[in-house]
Amino acid sequence: MAEQVKLSVELIACSSFTPPADVEWSTDVEGAEALVEFAGRACYETFDKPNPRTASNAAYLRHIMEVGHTALLEHANATMYIRGISRSATHELVRHRHFSFSQLSQRFVHSGESEVVVPTLIDEDPQLRELFMHAMDESRFAFNELLNALEEKLGDEPNALLRKKQARQAARAVLPNATESRIVVSGNFRTWRHFIGMRASEHADVEIREVAVECLRKLQVAAPTVFGDFEIETLADGSQMATSPYVMDF
């Protein structure tokens, strides 16, 4: 029987920063946000902080956002490990081509018992949920039947790994879009801001919006100034969205 899985987003990597020993400059933060500030000051040789209004890291980064110099954000990177996301949502995610992706392979990993992501609109209605889970079970049954038949059909192939791969890549055609996937996503801060600005919008699909909001939460901890302009709101249906006054600056 198909089992439901919930979304999980983890920040597994974020840029560190080692300032050059021979540059006389210091700042009040470490890591990715210090790197962004250093890159900006390197453009204009302002390591001595001549403008008191942008002397702190937070003030400097806010100024970057205000004037639209967001190219500096491309020096800092973050990597997320996302689980409990449907294949249909990952198809939307991979359209953001400035990210780098490594996704669970349905050719090498058996999908016959994988979990499913239930859309919220269906999950909140017991009758619709029962119909949905029945459809998942039927598609899983068809997958396993096809897989067994294909492995038998390919029985003359001496390489067992190749035989299984060829069988899975054909049988997976009947797997539903709701099948859970797992994906590692890496991108610079500018790309993450663009993704959140586009996909945390109330006009985005509910699932990809949830992914974007969860990524934002992780990034607001790792880089509170760079992502602090985004505000998370709860909509009438209980789902969440995020907005920023700088969202049109991407």
UniProtKB/Swiss-Prot annotation:
Pathway: Pyrimidine metabolism; dTTP biosynthesis. InterPro entries: Thymidylate_synthase_ThyX, Thymidylate_synthase_ThyX_sf. Residues 7-233 form the ThyX domain. A motif (ThyX motif) lies at residues 95-105. Keywords: FAD, Flavoprotein, Methyltransferase, NADP, Nucleotide biosynthesis, Transferase. Its cofactor is FAD. Its EC number is 2.1.1.148. The active site is at residue 199. Binds 4 FAD per tetramer. Each FAD binding site is formed by three monomers. GO terms for biological process: dTMP biosynthetic process; dTTP biosynthetic process; methylation. SUPFAM superfamilies: Thymidylate synthase-complementing protein Thy1. It catalyses: dUMP + (6R)-5,10-methylene-5,6,7,8-tetrahydrofolate + NADPH + H(+) = dTMP + (6S)-5,6,7,8-tetrahydrofolate + NADP(+). The keyword Transferase applies. One of its GO terms (molecular function) is flavin adenine dinucleotide binding. FAD binds at residues 95-97, 103, 188-190, 194. Disulfide bonds: none annotated. DUMP binds at residues 92-95, 103-107, 172, 199. It holds the Pfam family Thy1. PROSITE patterns: THYX. The keyword Flavoprotein applies. Catalyzes the reductive methylation of 2'-deoxyuridine-5'-monophosphate (dUMP) to 2'-deoxythymidine-5'-monophosphate (dTMP) while utilizing 5,10-methylenetetrahydrofolate (mTHF) as the methyl donor, and NADPH and FADH(2) as the reductant. Homotetramer. Belongs to the thymidylate synthase ThyX family. This is Flavin-dependent thymidylate synthase.
